[in-house]
Amino acid sequence: MAKPLSISSHPSIHLAWRAYFEMTKPKVVALMLLTVLVGMCLAMPTILPVKPLVAGLLGIAMMAGSAAALNHLIDRRIDGMMARTYNRPLPKGRVSATRALLFAALLGSLGFVILYVFTNPLTAWLTFASLIGYALIYTAYLKRATPQNIVIGGLAGAMPPLLGWTAVTNQFHGHALLLVIIIFLWTPPHFWALAIHRRAEYAKVDIPMLPVTHGVEFTKTCILLYTILLAIACLLPVLVGMSGPLYFVCSSLLSTGFIYKAWQLKYQDCEGLAMQVFRFSIYHLMLLFMALLLDHYLWA
């Protein structure tokens, strides 16, 4: 009698799906979806409509996963030379370049159709523009062309709150752009801190990250300046009446913490501080947007 098929009897199938899932950068996409959700919620004074909520999150997630897979594909050579990324699916041969391209194309196409049909064309095209901005303009060109790669390319990564806003309103709004500004200013210190820690690897693969081209001390100064600019930007939702006291308190505490970590990085010679700044920046963004969400429903 033939044995029934199961995933456990075919571990290679399970490993293959894990490789494709890994290429979508699920942790990065999860944080991005939080900012999308906050954009949606802040756009609506009442409960979110189900269809644009579900379709918007699903479609944006799929297109973000597609962009991440294209990033894996384009960076496969340098990924194989860096300790942080050498174990990714393409450098290890777990997924071929052809299959990675087909996977990214299929995932992105499905996401676009979902957004276009079940959300609105505006959100579909804006998300597509973000995909092109991240996967092609940033990854394929800017990353290798200029030490300001993160600053210029960061605009594509700052779009999610706007995508969430348009998904439920089908229109632009100045408040959504404030959220974009916050993420835009958050991105450089976040990535530059990682680049300081990995500067030798970036130099090895000829990626002109700021610590490689301008030195560590200059980069530390830039991180500190950007955290101060970010702190100012984080106050804008309060100043325009978009958010209330709860967000103001949380934002002030988080900004103070971020500036303190950046100050430590600049003026204390301590091993591991760059990665502390990098990790703190992730918590900063996550908690900041959670505070925006909670404040919206408590003070709306």
UniProtKB/Swiss-Prot annotation:
Pathway(s) of this molecule: Porphyrin-containing compound metabolism; heme O biosynthesis; heme O from protoheme: step 1/1
CDD domains named in the record: PT_UbiA_Cox10
InterPro entries, per the entry: Protohaem_IX_farnesylTrfase, UbiA_prenyltransferase, UbiA_prenylTrfase_CS, UbiA_sf
Pfam families: UbiA
Subcellular location: Cell inner membrane
Enzyme Commission code(s) on record: 2.5.1.141
Transmembrane regions listed in the UniProt entry: 28-48, 54-74, 100-120, 122-142, 149-169, 176-196, 222-242, 243-263, 280-300
GO molecular function: protoheme IX farnesyltransferase activity
Substrates-to-products reaction catalysed: heme b + (2E,6E)-farnesyl diphosphate + H2O = Fe(II)-heme o + diphosphate
Record's keyword terms, sorted: Cell inner membrane, Cell membrane, Heme biosynthesis, Membrane, Transferase, Transmembrane, Transmembrane helix
Enzyme class: transferase
UniProt cross-references to Gene3D superfamilies, sorted A to Z: UbiA prenyltransferase (1.10.357.140)
Any one annotated GO CC term: plasma membrane
PROSITE patterns reported in the protein's UniProt record: UBIA
Keyword Iron assigned: no
Membrane topology, as annotated: Multi-pass membrane protein
PANTHER family: 4-HYDROXYBENZOATE SOLANESYLTRANSFERASE (PTHR43448:SF7), PROTOHEME IX FARNESYLTRANSFERASE, MITOCHONDRIAL (PTHR43448)
Function text: Converts heme B (protoheme IX) to heme O by substitution of the vinyl group on carbon 2 of heme B porphyrin ring with a hydroxyethyl farnesyl side group.
Similarity-based family: Belongs to the UbiA prenyltransferase family. Protoheme IX farnesyltransferase subfamily.
Any further remark recorded for this protein: Carbon 2 of the heme B porphyrin ring is defined according to the Fischer nomenclature.
Protein name: Protoheme IX farnesyltransferase 1
